[in-house]
């Protein structure tokens, strides 16, 4: 059994409620990487896609057991924001249990917050997670439609522009709901603006 098959076997064994979303991310990841980064292999994109929410439904105890076992530290925002835990615990499993390469692991790690200077696979998983077809939130649909329109126009910055738009919407939502915003998200947005992305 290769690594991708093992990840899928272990994932489906969890009886996840989110499996449709994860499958949607896998499908979108293939589409996005084929359009922008065809050098990324299908297996690489799929490993990252299937790992990204691998621990999403874990309990607090399960997350923190992983953090302790693998020496994963949380900053103040992460410690106070439960929705960020799964990215770090899934990263730990990707790296230490499944032995996936660093590119896949960082794509899993930053799929929720983004970061400045995201690498190709990180961009693929970040956007795939936001726009996959089962997402029905207004913001997700808006970014999905915007990305499709930019691609149709053959905009060379379609991917980065869609990511920037999603970051704007995420920050706005977090501000309006008075929740903490991770510094990586601000830095990801500012980096794209400095690169001239609109």
Descriptions of predicted regions:
Residues 82:
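Catalytic, metal-anchored helix/loop core of enzyme active sites in primary metabolism
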Residues 3-5, 87, 104:
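N-terminal alpha-helical segment
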Residues 17, 78-79:
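A generic structural signal for short
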Residues 86-95:
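Alpha-helical segment that forms one wall of the substrate-binding/catalytic cleft
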Residues 13-23, 27-38, 51-55, 62, ...:
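Divalent metal-dependent phosphate-bond-processing catalytic cores, especially two-metal-ion Mg2+/Mn2+ enzymes
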Residues 1-15:
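Generic N-terminal amphipathic, Lys/Arg-enriched alpha-helix
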Residues 6, 42-77, 90, 108-114:
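His-Asp-centered metal-binding catalytic motifs of divalent-metal-dependent phosphohydrolases/nucleases
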Residues 4-8, 26, 30, 91:
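An amphipathic alpha-helix signature
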């Amino acid at each position: 059994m290769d690594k991708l098959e093992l990840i899928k076997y272990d994932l489906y064994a969890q009886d996840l409620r989110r499996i449709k979303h994860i499958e949607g991310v896998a499908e979108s990841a293939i589409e996005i990487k084929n359009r922008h980064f065809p050098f990324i292999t299908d297996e690489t994109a799929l490993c990252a896609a299937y790992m990204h929410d691998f621990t999403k439904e874990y309990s607090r105890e399960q997350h923190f057991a992983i953090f302790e076992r693998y020496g994963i530290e949380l900053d103040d925002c992460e410690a106070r924001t439960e929705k960020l835990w799964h990215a770090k615990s899934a990263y730990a499993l990707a790296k230490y249990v499944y032995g996936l390469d660093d590119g896949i692991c960082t794509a899993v790690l930053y799929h929720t917050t983004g970061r400045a200077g995201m690498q190709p696979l990180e961009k693929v998983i970040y956007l795939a997670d936001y726009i996959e077809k089962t997402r029905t939130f207004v913001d997700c649909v808006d970014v999905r439609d915007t990305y499709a329109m930019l691609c149709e126009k053959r905009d060379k910055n379609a991917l980065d522009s869609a990511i920037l738009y999603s970051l704007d919407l995420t920050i706005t939502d977090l501000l309006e709901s008075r929740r903490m915003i991770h510094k990586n998200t601000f830095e990801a947005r500012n980096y794209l603006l400095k690169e001239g992305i609109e």
